[in-house]
Amino acid sequence: MGAIYKRELSGYFNSAIGYVVLAVYYFFSGLFFYLYCFYRDSASLGYVFANMFYIVMFIIPVLTMKTFSEERRQKTDQALLTSPVSLTEIVLGKFLGAFTIYGLCCAIFLVYGVVISFFAQPQWSVVLCTLLGMLLLGMAIIAMNIFISSLTESMVVAAVIGMAAGLVIDTMSSFSKLVPIQWVQFILEKIDFLNYYTNFTYGILSIVDVIFFLSVTGLFLFFTVRVLERRRWS
């Protein structure tokens, strides 16, 4: 798994993808930081974190679009699938590579917290709790998009489908309120990512929210392993 992880991580920095994702994330987080903290003279990062929820849904598909689709396009997937490394290790190696880049993106919020501390007293407990929520959210979305990437050999298709899925997640909270059928509304609310993420932005650390994101992550990684397993024996 270590070799897969190192290969994946170096691949991000040997291409433009890693730099583009970092640049876009830093740009929007910096923009929101200026608008909601400096411009409004506020010590709270809550609105910054809240708005980054929507940005994450669209940059992660770009980050993960090449994980398996590029392997299929270049016909290197068969060598990977027949290697002595287990399919689970392959999937985890690629997942951790993408998550490391995402973690570097999220680390900028620690810098923002330090900057605020020069002028006011930031609520570090809320900042760290929300940062944990953003990392858990990223884990789930990365796992989902890696699964999407395993289904196609086109990076563009993987990115577009991933963004479409992100758009559905972004609008699910609003859509669930418009559904007249109560049991459907209940289900939509229970799978609404924003509901679970919002609790973190209030500094509320709930085991239910943590389990939700970890479960989604594990489920999509499991699905990805099953896709690769079927391809190995086909």
Annotate each language-model stretch with its function.
Residues 1-18:
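Aromatic- and glycine-rich beta-strand/loop motifs that create alpha-glucan
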Residues 16-36, 51-60, 164-168:
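Hydrophobic alpha-helical transmembrane segments of multi-pass membrane transport/permease proteins
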Residues 30-34, 40, 45-51, 55, ...:
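Secretory targeting signals
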Residues 36-42, 46, 161, 165-227, ...:
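Terminal transmembrane helical anchor/hairpin motif
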Residues 44-48, 63-81, 95:
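Transmembrane helix boundary and interhelical loop/hinge segments in multi-pass membrane proteins
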Residues 60-64, 112, 143-144, 223-224:
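Hydrophobic/aromatic residues in alpha-helical transmembrane segments
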Residues 88-92:
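Alpha-helix N-cap/helix-start motif at helix boundaries, enriched for small hydrophobics
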